[in-house]
């Protein structure tokens, strides 16, 4: 059962700071949180002995520990589409790319990420977190085709529990140094 005004705490990219800083706070306060790691980053850092909190990403072992606690769950943030360059912005279609090629690329990426979660002892994610918050109708169609039942974007708005679709859920970004009271006031 949810409180009258529930707050969902989410983290994108799967930074190691989720494990080092957020996980102890979740344990201390009994809070539940969501992290959406980029699966290729977790794959990479699981194979390295590099755990620098300033730049490293969550390993599969760390995610299993966090998931087992019941305080964290993990959602899909793509396998390797968290890029912002001249060729592509996140999961958006490139200029000149055919719809068939775009669909093939997305489905392969989403399925590879989903498989890695399961292969590494985690539940298959049910939510897709858009890299950079970038989305469009075609992308949403493919997200649904892959079986996701919710998406997290970056549009700042309050979500209401209505029983309606859980696609395009809004969130409020809290950059470093930003007073949490400002976000809570925005969400009123």
Model-derived features with residue positions:
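Active-site environment of divalent metal-dependent phosphoester hydrolases
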Residues: 16-18, 81-83, 132-138, 158-161
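Metal-dependent polysaccharide deacetylase catalytic core of the NodB/CE4 family, i.e.
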Residues: 4-7, 27-136, 167-169
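Short acidic donor-binding/metal-coordinating loop in glycosyltransferase active sites
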Residues: 11-14, 130
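Solvent-exposed coil/turn segments that connect beta secondary-structure elements
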Residues: 14, 38-40, 79, 156, ...
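A short acidic, amphipathic alpha-helical/loop segment
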Residues: 21-25, 138-142
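C-terminal domain-boundary segment and adjacent tail
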Residues: 1, 68, 118-120, 140, ...
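Membrane-embedded segments
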Residues: 4-6, 10, 18-22
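Short, basic, helix/turn surface patches
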Residues: 14-17, 21, 67-70, 104, ...
């Amino acid at each position: 059962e949810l409180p009258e005004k529930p707050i969902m705490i989410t983290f994108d990219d799967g930074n190691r700071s989720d494990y080092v800083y957020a996980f102890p706070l979740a344990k201390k306060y009994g809070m539940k949180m969501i992290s959406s790691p980029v699966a290729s980053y977790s794959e990479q850092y699981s194979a390295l002995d590099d755990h620098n909190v300033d730049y490293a990403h969550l390993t599969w072992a760390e995610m299993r520990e966090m998931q087992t606690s019941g305080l964290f769950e993990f959602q899909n943030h793509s396998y390797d589409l968290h890029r912002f360059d001249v060729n592509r912005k996140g999961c958006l279609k490139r200029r000149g790319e055919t719809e068939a090629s775009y669909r093939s690329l997305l489905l392969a990426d989403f399925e590879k990420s989903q498989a890695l979660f399961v292969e590494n002892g985690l539940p298959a994610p049910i939510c897709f977190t858009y890299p950079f918050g970038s989305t469009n109708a075609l992308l949403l169609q493919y997200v649904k085709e892959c079986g996701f039942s919710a998406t997290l974007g970056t549009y700042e708005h309050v979500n209401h529990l209505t029983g309606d679709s859980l696609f395009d859920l809004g969130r409020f970004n809290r950059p470093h140094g930003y007073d949490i009271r400002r976000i809570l006031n925005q969400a009123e």
